[in-house]
């Protein structure tokens, strides 16, 4: 853990639709030492998606005698080697005096070579390109810029959070007159936006957002929170989202029973993309411009906010031992991402329901979606959940056209396992203990140093007063089917086809591209398509002599006879090929969960789980002024 700079409550904003260039400045603490590494970031080339960085590294910030700088290859929370150094160019030593220079020494490293005094600070300059709009990559434009620390800030190698926790960092934004929002500590008395971080972990874990943005504050749990709006807000209901985000925050705080941060920021990028990434005291989320106008999308946005905010406890503080301090130059693996992401994925929809922001029907629809996804993924029979977690770096974040058959998502199956674990604990304890109980105790017990996989399992067994090892082995370490039927009976839930007519229709067993739905992206193992030899990359031209429209084969397949054999014409490698397909019904038709109302109903258990049914708040009228 790094020691954070003291924050002044005087810098907390009141709710407002407009910002000054630097919204608040912390007052210097007499005990605070000046940061030793200084970055000056110039944003004059944002129109070309570039930032210019100059950095000064004191001699004392290096490890040993070698003067080597490195850039992370990944960012925490997103388990994929992204090789951010491919976006860095023009790295040069500014004070070599002609006797020394920077030499590329690894894909993400630069080393000072030549005659360079060991007591001299290292001053470098480089350019960073950013034009990929995701929550884990840099994106620079005049209208909106998102700076990701891992993709931007070179630091003395080797890059590990524990080695650099005693080093302070200062970031100066030169020439930036736009509003700026970040979890980094502002520095008072500077002519340009300037921020400090106590350690490299904090620097990397604090995205910087600037451009056309607005900040809106609310209180929850006696702590200030800020909803930052960025992007096209003309169709976005600020009043509704601010009110409901506050309710989500309060519900999650009540779940954990304590608040571990001083101020929390929700950076809401309204950009028609989707995604979220957790940080210690903030999150970056992306959503549709019209999400507040569409009920399903809005509930999804609330669940996304809940998911990332839940991570402020589960992942950022309660974590598997491997997930901190970080090694930023190589993969960090753990079998416990099912806890980090799967458990969080279970609670994101559930806590939105408990907050009264969704109905029981909407929640059961969301849980149905998790079950349908799992049961329509043949990979569940191939890859155990703990292995899916260990392989996150090469599987989930790098899917292939056969991933549906060989892989499983630790988000998806992890959420289902969390639901089943909650069920097991409630059943064993006769409702006196729940997964909520386990998570709160795990937070108290393991936040300081992290937990091992067997420690989390043992804690769950202890709290439930029942040996759960058999459940864990089946659900996590094998590919056996999960005990879903028993959970349905316990909760008094029906699991019926969403549409009996559709469930009885012919089934092909392939997935097509999002743009041109005639292009085959993947083929489900054992399906009629697979048995007939259809393959990823095929272009579907005709089925039973009828041309396949750009919307895909579904409009034809639904009229075909189950058990019938039909010709399917495809284009493969530039040649026409005909396959003979025998159509069946789907082995896992879309189903929906509904609470029983007669025999087998469990209304008391449902209420203890989902909370009392309530009318969701109406959408507030009015949007933020552009």
PLM regions: where:
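N-terminal secretory signal peptides that target proteins for export/translocation
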Residues: 1-6
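Bacterial N-terminal signal peptides
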Residues: 8-21
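Early extracytoplasmic/domain-onset interaction patches
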Residues: 27-74
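Intrinsic-disorder/low-complexity, polar/charged segments enriched in Ser/Thr/Lys/Arg/Asp/Glu/Gln
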Residues: 36-38, 50-54, 66-68, 121-123, ...
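Non-catalytic architectural context of zinc metalloproteases
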Residues: 44, 56, 76, 81-90, ...
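An active-site-proximal "capping" alpha-helix that borders the catalytic cofactor pocket
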Residues: 91, 252, 339-351
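Juxtacatalytic substrate-recognition/specificity segment
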Residues: 214-337, 343
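C-terminal recognition in membrane/secretory proteostasis and scaffolding
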Residues: 348, 358-626
């Amino acid at each position: 853990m790094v020691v954070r700079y003291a924050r002044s409550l005087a810098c907390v904003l009141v709710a407002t639709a407009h910002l000054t260039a630097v919204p608040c400045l912390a007052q210097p603490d007499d005990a605070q030492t000046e940061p030793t590494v200084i970055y000056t970031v110039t944003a004059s080339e944002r129109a070309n998606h570039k930032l210019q960085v100059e950095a000064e590294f004191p001699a004392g910030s290096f490890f040993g005698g070698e003067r080597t700088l490195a850039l992370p290859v990944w960012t925490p929370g997103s388990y994929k080697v992204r090789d951010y150094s491919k976006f860095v160019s023009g790295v040069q030593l500014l004070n070599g005096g002609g006797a020394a220079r920077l030499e590329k020494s690894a894909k993400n490293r630069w080393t000072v070579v030549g005659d360079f005094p060991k007591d001299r600070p290292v001053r470098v300059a480089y350019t960073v390109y950013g034009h990929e709009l995701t929550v884990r990559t840099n994106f620079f434009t005049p209208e909106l810029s998102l700076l990701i620390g891992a993709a931007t800030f070179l630091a003395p190698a080797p890059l590990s959070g524990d080695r650099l926790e005693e080093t302070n960092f200062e970031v100066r934004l030169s020439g930036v007159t736009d509003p700026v929002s970040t979890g980094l500590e502002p520095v008072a008395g500077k002519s340009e936006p300037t921020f400090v971080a106590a350690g490299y972990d904090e620097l990397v874990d604090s995205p910087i957002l600037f451009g056309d943005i607005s900040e809106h504050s609310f209180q929850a749990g006696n702590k200030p929170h800020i909803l930052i709006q960025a992007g096209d807000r003309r169709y976005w209901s600020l009043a509704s989202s601010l009110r409901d985000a506050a309710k989500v925050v309060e519900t999650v705080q009540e779940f954990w029973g304590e608040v571990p941060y001083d101020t929390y920021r929700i950076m809401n990028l309204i950009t028609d993309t989707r995604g979220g990434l957790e940080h210690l005291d903030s999150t970056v989320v992306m959503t549709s411009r019209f999400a507040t106008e569409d009920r399903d999308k809005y509930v999804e946005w609330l669940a996304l906010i809940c998911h990332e905010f839940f991570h402020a406890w589960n992942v950022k503080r309660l974590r598997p031992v491997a997930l901190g301090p970080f090694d930023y130059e190589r993969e960090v693996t753990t079998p416990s991402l099912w806890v980090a992401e799967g458990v969080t994925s279970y609670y994101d929809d559930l806590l939105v329901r408990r907050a009264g922001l969704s109905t029981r029907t909407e929640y059961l629809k969301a849980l149905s979606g998790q079950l349908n996804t799992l049961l329509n993924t043949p990979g569940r029979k191939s890859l155990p959940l703990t292995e899916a977690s260990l392989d996150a770096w090469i599987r989930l974040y790098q899917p292939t056209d056969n991933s549906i058959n060989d892989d499983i998502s630790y988000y998806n199956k992890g959420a289902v396992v969390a639901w089943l674990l909650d069920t097991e604990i409630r059943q064993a304890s006769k409702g006196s203990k729940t997964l909520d109980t386990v998570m709160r105790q795990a937070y108290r017990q393991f936040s300081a140093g992290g937990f091992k996989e067997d420690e989390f399992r043992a804690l769950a067994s202890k709290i439930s007063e029942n040996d759960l090892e058999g459940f864990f082995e089946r659900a996590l370490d094998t590919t056996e089917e999960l005990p879903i039927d028993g959970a349905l009976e316990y909760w008094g839930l029906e699991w019926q086809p969403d549409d009996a007519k559709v469930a009885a229709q012919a089934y092909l067993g392939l997935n097509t591209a999002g743009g041109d739905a005639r292009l085959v992206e993947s083929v489900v193992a054992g399906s009629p398509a697979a048995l007939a030899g259809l393959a990823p990359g095929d272009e579907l031209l005709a089925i039973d002599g009828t041309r396949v429209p750009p919307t895909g084969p579904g409009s034809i397949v639904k009229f075909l006879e189950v058990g019938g054999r039909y010709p399917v014409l495809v284009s493969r490698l530039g040649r026409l090929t005909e396959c003979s397909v025998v159509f069946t019904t789907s082995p896992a038709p879309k189903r929906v969960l509904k609470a029983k109302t007669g025999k087998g109903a469990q209304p008391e258990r449902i209420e203890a789980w989902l909370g009392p049914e309530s009318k969701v708040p109406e959408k507030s009228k009015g949007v933020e002024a552009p």
